[in-house]
Amino acid sequence: NSAHPCCDPVTCKPKRGEHCISGPCCENCKFLTAGTVCLPAWGDFDNDLCTGISSDCPRNPWHKS
């Protein structure tokens, strides 16, 4: 059983000095830079962009539900 390289096996949280474990805005245990496209534009809607402070990809408020 191999542990995730970003995860502290005791706490199941990111290791000291790391930002994240996984997510569309997480790469190599770090948050992607603000403005990085995490969901490309489609139709008449703009790209969804990483914030630089979260591993989540925030939804563009102009996307259809």
From Swiss-Prot:
Q: Where would I look for the motif Cell attachment site in this sequence?
A: 42-44
Give the subcellular location: Secreted
According to its UniProt entry, one GO biological process term is:
cell adhesion
Q: Which PROSITE patterns does this entry report, sorted A to Z?
A: DISINTEGRIN_2
All residue ranges annotated as the Disintegrin domain in the record: 1-65
Which GO terms fall under molecular function for this chain's record? toxin activity
Which InterPro entries does the record match to this protein?
Answer: Disintegrin_dom, Disintegrin_dom_sf
Look up the record and report any one GO term of the cellular component aspect.
extracellular region
**Tissues of expression:** Expressed by the venom gland.
Cysteine disulfide links: C6-C29, C20-C26, C25-C50, C38-C57
For this UniProt record, give its keywords in alphabetical order, as a comma-separated list. Answer: Cell adhesion, Cell adhesion impairing toxin, Disulfide bond, Secreted, Toxin
Chief location of this protein?
A: secreted
Report any Pfam family annotated for this entry: Disintegrin
Q: Which family does it belong to?
A: Belongs to the disintegrin family. Dimeric disintegrin subfamily.
Instruction: Share what the entry says about its subunit structure, partners included.
Output: Heterodimer with CC8A; disulfide-linked.
PANTHER family attached here? ADAM A DISINTEGRIN AND METALLOPROTEASE DOMAIN (PTHR11905), ADAM METALLOPROTEASE (PTHR11905:SF159)
Entry function: Inhibits integrins alpha-IIb/beta-3 (ITGA2B/ITGB3), alpha-V/beta-3 (ITGAV/ITGB3), and alpha-5/beta-1 (ITGA5/ITGB1).
Name assigned to this protein? Disintegrin CC8B
What is the organism of origin for this protein? Cerastes cerastes (Horned desert viper)
